[in-house]
């Protein structure tokens, strides 16, 4: 799939044709999940309140768009291919219209704070009474139940609580907030999407829908496979920047070049590391690999990392890109987004 709306070149563009989705979500997690459904051929009806509507409308909006009262690119990107209906769900008329839509729908996706749908008279029991096959997906920060259910939060809070943010730090301990919303996108969008598709298959087989409780914080924690395994094996959480995949192994890390840019070395397997060593003329490094006993984060490993950094700091990024271009060693430049969009890998 290459486009951001339904794509005729995508073999999945009609995979969900005939599926009807009602989307009450706003901002990023829910709208991205339902965007994927629309891209795969589902009929997605986005319901917004008659006032300001989805807050995403005003994010990253140009002055011209604001003056014209038009939504910005962020909203348009997340809601391409969807129909939009303005409803006041606090009014009897608005609720009646929504329930009419739900009678013929396959799924309802919502992202209100837990309890809001029930207070509106639109909880799972109420909507399933009108459509027993309906799958309802509720996306929230901390789940529909439990002591944290009513707490507000955003992506930064979900990844902080799930132990992910603590790992996104340099050796000096400074945390770098990623400009990729892991909690929203993995814990919210992708988790909701995969669970919804499974629930739709079950509903078609059994004739009964279900209510899916998607907690973004819990989903991020559930996906902490690498660090959690390290914790179980070592009895402790590896310090940030010192684990096998976070910078503790010289063969797998990010290195600064002479021009202040960075090179990503992903030579995780021994054969790739040997390719790096041969290319740099450092055969003495070949046996210094985690698979041969040099523990990630150990003093010898960090010393070798410093040696490799010193070598890569002698030349600008373009030099190393050219050097490693034909070497099978998993070495790539760290690109800015504008560079990535122009790169032949993505531009074609």
Regions from the language model: what does each represent?
Residues 57-62, 233-240:
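Short Pro/Gly-enriched beta-strand edge/turn motifs at strand-loop
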Residues 144, 173-182, 204-220, 236, ...:
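Conserved Rossmann-fold dehydrogenase catalytic segment
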Residues 164, 188-191, 212-221, 268:
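NAD(P)-dependent dehydrogenases' Rossmann-like dinucleotide-binding region
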Residues 251-331:
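Aromatic-enriched alpha-helical interface/lid elements that frame and gate functional surfaces
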């Amino acid at each position: 799939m290459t486009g951001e709306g339904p794509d005729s070149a995508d073999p999945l563009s009609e995979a969900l044709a005939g599926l009807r989705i009602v989307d009450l979500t706003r901002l990023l997690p829910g709208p991205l999940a339902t965007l994927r459904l629309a891209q795969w051929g589902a009929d997605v009806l986005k319901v917004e309140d008659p006032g300001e509507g989805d807050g995403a409308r005003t994010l990253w909006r140009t002055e011209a768009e604001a003056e014209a009262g038009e939504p910005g690119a962020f909203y348009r990107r997340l809601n391409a291919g969807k129909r939009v209906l303005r409803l006041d769900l606090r009014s009897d008329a608005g609720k009646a219209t929504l329930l009419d839509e739900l009678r013929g729908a396959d799924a309802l996706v919502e992202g209100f704070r837990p309890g809001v749908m029930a207070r509106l008279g639109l909880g799972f029991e109420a909507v399933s009474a009108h459509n027993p096959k309906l799958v309802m997906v509720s996306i929230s920060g901390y789940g529909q139940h439990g002591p944290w259910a009513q707490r507000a939060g955003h992506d930064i809070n979900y990844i902080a609580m799930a132990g992910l943010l603590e790992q996104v730090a340099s050796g000096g301990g400074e945390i770098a907030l990623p400009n990729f919303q892991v909690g929203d996108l993995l814990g919210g969008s992708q988790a909701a999407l995969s669970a919804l598709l499974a629930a739709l298959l079950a509903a078609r087989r059994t004739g009964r829908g279900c209510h899916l409780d998607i907690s973004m914080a819990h989903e991020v924690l559930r996906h902490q496979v690498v660090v959690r395994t390290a914790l179980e094996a070592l009895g402790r959480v590896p310090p940030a920047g010192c684990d096998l995949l976070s910078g503790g192994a010289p063969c797998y890390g990010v290195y600064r070049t002479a021009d202040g840019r960075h090179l990503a070395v992903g030579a995780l397997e021994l054969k790739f590391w040997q390719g790096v060593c041969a290319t740099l003329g450092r055969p003495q490094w070949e046996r210094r690999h985690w698979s041969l006993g040099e523990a990630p984060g150990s003093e010898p490993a960090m010393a070798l990392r410093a040696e490799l950094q010193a070598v890569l700091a002698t030349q600008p990024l373009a030099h190393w890109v050219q050097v490693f271009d034909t070497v099978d060693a998993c070495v790539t430049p760290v690109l800015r987004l504008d560079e990535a969009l122009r790169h032949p890998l993505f531009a074609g």
